[in-house]
Each structure stands twice: as C-alpha cells, then as structure tokens.
C-alpha cells in the first residue's frame, strides 16, 4: 500500500513538472512568434532620472504612452491594479505609436497593458545589455517593439535613437 502511494506521488510530481514546462514553453513560443511576425512599432521613452537609467547591465525604461495612460486613468489605479486592458493606438508615418481616442477610426490597433502598483506596465521596464556596452544605449529615445495584431501583446526587441536607427 505504501509503495503504491509513493509511486502515485511520483507520477503526480512528474506530471506537474511536465505541465509547468509545457506552459512555460508555450509562453516562450508565443513571444517568439510575436517577435518574428509582429508589426514593428516604436514607443517613445519618457524622461527618467538619469542616475537611475543605467543600472549595471540593464537600462530602466519608462514610456511616454504609459504616462499618458496613467494620466487618463488617474484615480482608478487601485481599482484597476493587476487588470489587463487594451489601449487604442495609431501609428504615425514613422511607426511611432500614439494613444488614440477609443472611438477613433484610426485606432485599429490595440496595445495590451496592465497596472502594476501605481504604474502602467507595457510588458517591460528594463532593457538588458552586454556588460560594458552602456555607452552605446545612452542615445536611446524609443523602444522598438513587435506588436501582435491579434492579442495586442508587444515584445521589446531593441532600442532606437531619435531617427529610429537601432542601437
């Protein structure tokens, strides 16, 4: 009886591990698919304390669109905390995303976001880079994303300068 119970426990443990690995691999595959096939969009970086931008081997990011969303939802962050929402966006001629009025004919695209704490979370707030290459990213003015048209998920694939040239 004890041996059967022990064997059943092992089977349950192995199945749980397989399930977790399958879920993680599915999430990774979804992000990779978005990065490979998504629409190129750029989000303007918002000003941030320069001493806080470069932290070792990563750069803290803040996006102007997130600031706009926070202002438009002022006073409701507590009620919205953790909830997923979609921001209607339009792209200018350069591919830079701007918040659109919800009923605008130009807002065929949506960007998925969530409130974390008191801030809008657009999927990332940091960009990691190779040790010793911080100087290269000091001229960053935009985050370069791939946007899934169907889900609204955006994957950061790099940073760009004022001319949208990759860094």
Could you tell me what each predicted segment is?
Residues 1-11:
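N-terminal positive-inside, membrane-proximal cytosolic segments immediately preceding the first
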Residues 10-27:
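Hydrophobic membrane-insertion alpha-helices, especially the h-region
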Residues 11, 79-111:
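Short peripheral tails and domain-boundary helices/loops at the edges of structured domains
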Residues 23-43:
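Aromatic-capped interface at the extracytoplasmic side
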Residues 38-40, 58-60, 82-86, 94, ...:
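Extracytoplasmic
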Residues 44-75:
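Short extracytoplasmic
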Residues 67-79, 95-99, 153-156:
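Short, Lys/Arg- and Gly-enriched loop/turn segments at beta-strand edges
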Residues 99-102, 110-167:
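Extracytoplasmic/periplasmic terminal helices and flexible tails
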